Amino acid sequence: MRAMVFSEKGELAAQIATILRERYEIDIYTTSDSPLDSYGAKVVFRITGESLYVDNISNFLADRFKEKGYDFIAIGSSVMGREIASILSELLHLEAITEIMKLEEGNQVFITERFFFGGKTVIREESKARIFTFLPGLVDPMPVDSRSSKEEIKIDSPSTVNVVEKIEKPKGSVNLEKADIIVSAGRGIGKKEGLGIIQQLADIIHGEVGGSRPVCLDYHWLSEERQVGLSGKRVKPKIYIAVGISGQVQHIAGMRGSKTVIAINKDKNAPIFNECDYGIVGDLYTVIPKLIENLKK
């Protein structure tokens, strides 16, 4: 079977290629400048144009899908990727399944797995869908020895989008998805000033500071880029320390890939203790200073 892979993010395209290349012949389509010729694709097509938006990119991909006779489309699950997937589903009259983390072939169907019920469980589905968006961070991109052919394709068709103004979003200072150690704060810290002790612990163990949805979006104690959860970042560090986090399913969905989870919470019945490898029941303002003291020795 042959697959069309698309992502505007080079790393995400490389991740999907790493997942699919052993079982399928793949071509990569991207608007990224990242070198992608070492990830097992037959051809890497770089899409260029003066005004590239989801509408003309989708129209182009739909035409190529029919022209090349691909069997299915694998798209990186980004804001743009999900929008393009929905447009392609309409243009090609094909079913789409989003946010998947596993894809297999069945008897004239595809079998997919994705998080369900806020990440608390995994749903395994059989369907005739032919468009899939893949969650980011499922694998680390692994290059191969062979090299792909490369082609550049310019889209000349104008977009129907009329850009009135562009406001650049400030670039973040942290990339939680890449962090090996994360110390996350929940509403249980009680006050913004409590982040000071969280930062101290993170600094000593060379980690990054993250936060739950309430801390980042409701109270604005931390920036949005530091939110871990279903609607925030999905992380998989070597060590994840949850401080004052109750462990609601929305948060667990974002840190489920962590190798070792340590929880600190004064509520012994907090759901986070069902998800952690090591748990400490106690007041964080007593526990963390003792941890810092011992780590300094």
Model segments located where?
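N-terminal glycine-rich FAD/FM-binding segment characteristic of electron-transfer flavoproteins
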Residues: M1-K297
